Amino acid sequence: MSQQPGSARRVNFPEEPMTLGEKFSHRMDQLKEIIADGGCSRAAKCVSITVCLVLLVLIFGGAIVYLVMSLTSSAQKMSADSMDISPQAIRHPKFWPPTDKIRFDDLNGIPMTSLFPQNVSTCSGFGFACTGAVHMVIPSSKRCDGRRDCEDGSDEENCKECQSVFSCKLRPEEESKKKGRSTVQPTLICLTAQHLCDNVENCPDGSDEAVCKSSCSKDQFKCPGSNACLPLSAKCDGINDCADASDEKNCSKCQNNAHKCGKQCIKASHVCDGVAQCADGSDEQQCDCQRCSGTDKALCDDGTCIMRTQVCDGKKDCTDGMDEEDCPGSCTIESFSPKLKMVTCSDGKQYTEAEACSGSFESCDHDCPNSKCHPKLAFTCPASKEARKMCISRRKVCDGTPDCDDGADEINCTPIKECGIAKNTQFKCDHKCLDSSRRCDGVWDCEDKSDEKGCDKCPSGTIKCAADKKCLPAFTRCNGVADCSDGSDELKCSCQECLGVHSNTYMCNESNRCLKRDEVCSPYSMCPNATYTDKAFCAALFLKKSGTSPF
């Protein structure tokens, strides 16, 4: 069938449904034909610019409406889920976050300072805030010292006074014009000795290269192999201005606020910086907020400056352990409970005396006070000339590997071939032979703990798992690990059971649950009915470990 010119139509088969644009175009074609039939034939022959513009406006407007609706929906969902932290970015945090300005907008605005012990200060308001990242604060001792500590170098800008060995004017021509007419201090460029006489002009007037002389004045000295004349005040200031460090040798006293440590001078920027340079830690004592300032520092009330990662890390760094008091996950032990005895083991961390003498922590093998190893849980290795008595786990006894210096843990072991299984006096496990009395006694003698399984009854002073017929050592109660299949050994924990026995545990704020401190956040709080404090603690650690916090 022939078609008349001008009456051609677009054919859309059922399997090709028209889009919104096609439908609109089709309707406009129909409109043009109606107009053409009415006498305006030219309208049917030309493409209406107005129609195209209207179509574009409608499409663009529809896209904007869709985008706005999507963003609004996402925002509402984010608001509704604002208390949740994505479980996909799982971390295993072990250290305290290094800042007091982490934003807790989703946690009712709990500030970092509220999670710090009462006798530890973050010294906010002191130090220098980097211009490009105001959350980054450096101590005043690092301001204008010739070294860039801020990423944008702002700590070395607009300097009116330098703490470096050399300085020059930023704009000597302008300063000379102002001479005698202005009391404004000139802006300085601060340089270290390494930038002097290096054939690179760092100063506009080249004065950093003009200090190269064959001889120096009486109030100056010269480093071996260098022509730079340095002021005598640069000696014994804790800064190696000479390549061979000869300017810091044989110091009877220190200059420029450096700290004397034996015959060594600790430079001012390393005094009260949270890291002990002296063996006695004296460079981190008697500090104040002016010196112990910075994003990653904390000041104890006794004047000790520490890193913020040391706060609430289980190790006492300040007098009387004030940096470990009232931390999130702590609780008040009943007043009638005896004072908990703590032991510092070889890893530098604090453990309860019971833990240190149980043989369960290898870092404490040599640190049990008076070598009084637990009579049931541990095996006591005899003392030797090189070492005192050791407390090792009973699981290491007769395992084929000597752990005691004299091999006492591998003596008098019944060979596996001679194990009297038939007489029911002995049993095998982990390729060793044990007396039957070792079964179901609440002490793990086998590496796989099979000697404490399938028990109908357990002796007093141990824990019985009714669900799976296991006997557990008493110290496993409320240690943050569910050893019973039904978790009954971790239910209804008291403060004494949680913190009075274990060292690395976290008491949930408002529930009788005790968790391992380094496992309480995964990354959200694992505490049942977690409080804002529990959530804030985990949020801070998550942001620190994931690197998403701008602080």
Swiss-Prot record:
Tissue specificity: Specifically expressed in developing oocytes of adult germ line.
Any Gene Ontology CC annotation: plasma membrane
Record topology, Extracellular segments: 70-551
Gene Ontology MF terms in the entry: signaling receptor activity
Keywords noted in UniProt: Cell membrane, Developmental protein, Disulfide bond, Endosome, Fertilization, Glycoprotein, Membrane, Receptor, Repeat, Signal-anchor, Transmembrane, Transmembrane helix
Cytoplasmic side: 1-48
Cell compartments where the protein resides: Cell membrane; Endosome membrane
Entries under InterPro entries matching the protein: LDL_receptor-like_sf, LDLR-related, LDLR_class-A_CS, LDrepeatLR_classA_rpt
Positions of disulphide bridges: 130-150, 144-159, 162-190, 168-203, 197-212, 216-229, 223-242, 236-251, 254-265, 261-278, 272-287, 292-305, 300-318, 312-327, 373-391, 381-404, 398-413, 419-433, 429-446, 440-455, 458-471, 465-484, 478-493
Residues spanning the membrane: 49-69
Membrane topology of the entry: Single-pass type II membrane protein
Free-text disruption phenotype from the record: Temperature sensitive phenotype with severe sterility at the restrictive temperature of 25 degrees Celsius. Zygotes exit the spermatheca with a pinched morphology and leave a trailing section behind and are polyspermic. The eggshell chitin layer is fragmented and often accumulates at one end of the embryo. Ovulation is severely reduced resulting in oocyte accumulation in the gonad and a disappearance of sperm in the spermatheca. Conversely, although sperm and oocyte appear to make contact in the spermatheca no visible fertilization occurs and endomitotic oocytes accumulate with age.
Entry's Gene Ontology BP terms: eggshell formation; positive regulation of protein localization to cell cortex; positive regulation of protein localization to plasma membrane; single fertilization
LDL-receptor class A domain boundaries: 122-160, 161-213, 215-252, 253-288, 291-328, 372-414, 418-456, 457-494
Free-text function comment from the UniProt entry: Probable receptor which is required for the oocyte-to-zygote transition although its exact function is controversial. Redundantly with egg-2, seems to be required for fertilization probably by promoting the interaction or fusion between sperm and oocyte. Conversely, shown to be dispensable for fertilization but required together with egg-2 for the formation of a continuous and cohesive eggshell chitin layer by maintaining a homogenous distribution of chitin synthase chs-1 at the unfertilized oocyte cell membrane.
Protein name: LDL receptor repeat-containing protein egg-1
Gene: egg-1
